[in-house]
Amino acid sequence: MAKEKFERNKPHVNIGTVGHVDHGKTTLTAAITKYFGDFKAYDQIDGAPEEKARGITISTAHVEYETEGRHYAHVDCPGHADYVKNMITGAAQMDGAILVVNAADGPMPQTREHILLARQVGVPALVVFMNKVDQVDDEELLELVEMEIRELLSSYDFPGDDIPIIAGSALAAMEGRDPEIGENKIKELMAAVDEYIPTPERAVDQPFLMPIEDVFSISGRGTVVTGRVERGVINVGDNIEIVGIKDTTTTTCTGVEMFRKLLDRGEAGDNIGALLRGIDREAVERGQVLCKPGSVTPHTKFEAEAYILTKEEGGRHTPFFANYRPQFYFRTTDVTGTVTLPEGTEMVMPGDNLKFEVELIAPIAMEDGLRFAIREGGRTVGAGVVSKILA
């Protein structure tokens, strides 16, 4: 059969496998590619190359496959630490995830941690694959494990009663045996993923936002700010807000240019210059954002989920304590902030991941799910994500 050319007429969804070590995430990933993509052997996936995201090295394997209705990009990580880093940095954006649980063991510590991380970093939906069912003889035991998984999901505010749980064997599917627990279950799983994990809103359909990277004044024309449009569309004549650092101001975009050509609009992914009406060059600075009025608000206090780099990763060599004051790098700029550790936590070691509160000295345009780097004098010592805005 001739290879079909890749067509972008299907909606694209980013997905990943999560769950406890050795519960079968990579085997399941390989099995899905066997039926829905170009087959990748287990060791091709497991020997994932290292990548850098926000100065942090992460091993991740990427595969792609498609169902009748969708195209998927799927990420699988070899080690637990890679998952933590991946989810916190957002290196591989996940629109949904497949939680793999070994039916013989039930939920284990990393099962819990990955569900918590998915909740904290805003993975919208999970589907469960209960793996290795051929190792469980007792039908009642499977039902108990399923109940336990549902209760666990509910305890982390996922809709435990509604989440699809498919029980099968990824290995049987890989080896092409016992289709009733193998191939058929992989197909059932992907049908559930197709139906249950929502199609993400495309970046251009979201409200306009552009982090400001640079500010120029052009004599006779006014002030131009440059940056890459993160999401949405900006048209000449649109009213926009400038948010963060200083008080929010409203202006009108009187021109959009790209590669020195004038355009009537800029959209997600474009590097543009936007001409702002009646705005003084001194009134805008790097680190602010241009956005659709009312879509994003400035904040100084938030709760974050963070990963602190190890010494080997170029991070700190020593722990930090209460009232630690590093810089938090949001989008295009550093803002100093003070860390409040959770009750009972005295210190944080390099290599830890934890939840803490931050209070910044200046407000930043912020929403849940915003990623940041933690820096000391320009050196990255950690990465985090805003899990909850406090003030």
Curated annotation (Swiss-Prot):
Listed PROSITE patterns: G_TR_1, G_TR_2
Class of the enzyme per the UniProt entry, highest EC level: hydrolase
Organism lineage string: Bacteria, Pseudomonadati, Pseudomonadota, Alphaproteobacteria, Rhodobacterales
Localization per record: Cytoplasm
Example GO molecular function: GTP binding
Physiological role: GTP hydrolase that promotes the GTP-dependent binding of aminoacyl-tRNA to the A-site of ribosomes during protein biosynthesis.
Region annotated G1, chain positions: 19-26
Reaction(s) catalysed (UniProt annotation): GTP + H2O = GDP + phosphate + H(+)
Occurrences of domain tr-type G (ranges): 10-201
Keyword Transport on entry: no
Enzyme Commission number(s) from the entry: 3.6.5.3
Record's protein name: Elongation factor Tu
Binding site for GTP: 19-26, 76-80, 131-134
Keyword Protein biosynthesis: yes
Region G5: start-end pairs: 169-171
Organism: Ruegeria sp. (strain TM1040)
Any single Gene Ontology cellular-component annotation: cytoplasm
Family of the protein in this entry: Belongs to the TRAFAC class translation factor GTPase superfamily. Classic translation factor GTPase family. EF-Tu/EF-1A subfamily.
Binding site for Mg(2+): 26
Region G3, annotated ranges: 76-79
Annotated spans, G4: 131-134
Keywords annotated in UniProt: Cytoplasm, Elongation factor, GTP-binding, Hydrolase, Magnesium, Metal-binding, Nucleotide-binding, Protein biosynthesis
Location of the region described as G2 in the Swiss-Prot/TrEMBL record: 55-59
Major location (coarse): cytoplasm
Subunit field text: Monomer.
InterPro entries assigned to the protein according to its UniProt record, in alphabetical order: EF-Tu_GTP-bd, EF-Tu_GTPase, EFTu-like_2, EFTU_2, G_TR_CS, P-loop_NTPase, Small_GTP-bd, T_Tr_GTP-bd_dom
